Amino acid sequence: MASLPDTNKLLRNFSRCRNWEERYLYMIELGAKLPPLTDEQRQPENLIAGCQSQVWILLRMNHQNKVEFIGDSDAAIVKGLVAIVFILFQGKTTQEILDLDVTEYFGKLSLEQHLTPSRTQGLHAMIHAIRNRTSKMV
């Protein structure tokens, strides 16, 4: 995966932003760190249902039994949300992903209070899809 900050650095960087315009710019910057997917990876089975923008997420198990993520979106802010979701789940086992309470992190980032309803719905769709796909890897 791209060089993304860990959750603590994400929270710290978010808190340093003076307003939500800066936070959106930071989210776009995070999304830009995700490498683009190939045409072969942009297949319907990798699309996330429930997102207004097109979002593709792929999962694979590495040799340390940790789940690795690659993903993309056709919208810059949504791609930043994909990166944030990956930051929360990176380096975790399937069970840790299934057990993680993401609402705590989203609360600390104040994400849901500042996203449009359709982006919030898409964010939840990403989490649901990742957990669903992760449960099939167990």
Curated annotation (Swiss-Prot):
Q: What is its main location?
A: cytoplasm
- Got any disulfides in this one, which pairs? none
UniProt keyword list? Cytoplasm
Q: Does the record's keyword annotation contain Lipid metabolism?
A: no
Biochemical pathway: Cofactor biosynthesis; iron-sulfur cluster biosynthesis
InterPro entries, alphabetically?
Cysteine_desulfuration_SufE (IPR023939), Fe-S_metab-assoc_dom (IPR003808)
One Gene Ontology cellular component: cytoplasm
Q: Which Pfam families match?
A: SufE (PF02657)
Active-site residue numbers: 51 (cysteine persulfide intermediate)
**Localized where?**
Cytoplasm
Q: Which Gene3D superfamilies match?
A: 3.90.1010.10
Q: Which GO BP terms, alphabetically?
A: iron-sulfur cluster assembly; sulfur compound metabolic process
Described purpose of this protein according to its UniProt entry? Participates in cysteine desulfuration mediated by SufS. Cysteine desulfuration mobilizes sulfur from L-cysteine to yield L-alanine and constitutes an essential step in sulfur metabolism for biosynthesis of a variety of sulfur-containing biomolecules. Functions as a sulfur acceptor for SufS, by mediating the direct transfer of the sulfur atom from the S-sulfanylcysteine of SufS, an intermediate product of cysteine desulfuration process.
Annotated family: Belongs to the SufE family.
Q: How does it assemble?
A: Homodimer. Interacts with SufS.
Know the name of this protein? Cysteine desulfuration protein SufE
